[in-house]
């Protein structure tokens, strides 16, 4: 069973699923943030728009792609999967590479859609002591969401 799972994870199809899922999530998070900024100056409304878009796209890509690759979509999720011996070191490194490429592709896509420079630094200054706390919480939320969905078999019935 473990050999079968490893073979499935090492397939081209699994790698494409990780690339595509990560790209879609990145494009949605970045693009919905850009769209929200265009819609309103109200920061609370911007965060709400971004959060709603992120939640729905995350549910969708987990539902669609978990059966193909495991729906890891983030190196932090892979670290947890590796520590739980759900994936091999080889899968960890190969998925990390395709996820990074997918994240870049998603960012480029979002920038292109909103007619911004395809590659460049963020125009939003993000600093302050609470930034690292918010990143840790967001990453922990992503890890929990993916593993709860996968471990409880919800990747197949996220929408009911």
Feature map (PLM): residue ranges:
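Membrane-interface helix-loop junctions and terminal tails of multi-pass membrane proteins
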Residues: 1-160
């Amino acid at each position: 069973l473990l050999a079968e799972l490893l073979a499935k994870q090492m397939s081209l199809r699994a790698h494409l699923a990780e690339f595509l899922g990560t790209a879609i999530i990145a494009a949605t998070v970045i693009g919905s943030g850009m769209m929200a900024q265009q819609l309103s100056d109200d920061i609370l409304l911007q965060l709400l728009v971004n959060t709603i878009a992120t939640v729905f796209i995350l549910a969708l890509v987990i539902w669609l792609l978990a059966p193909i690759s495991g729906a890891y979509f983030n190196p932090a999720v892979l670290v947890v999967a590796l520590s739980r011996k759900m994936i091999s070191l080889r899968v960890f490194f190969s998925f990390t590479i395709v996820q990074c490429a997918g994240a870049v592709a998603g960012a480029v896509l979002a920038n292109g859609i909103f007619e911004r420079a395809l590659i460049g630094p963020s125009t939003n200054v993000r600093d302050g002591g609470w930034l690292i706390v918010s990143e840790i919480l967001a990453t922990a939320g992503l890890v929990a969401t993916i593993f709860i969905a996968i471990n409880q078999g919800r990747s197949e019935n996220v929408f009911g």
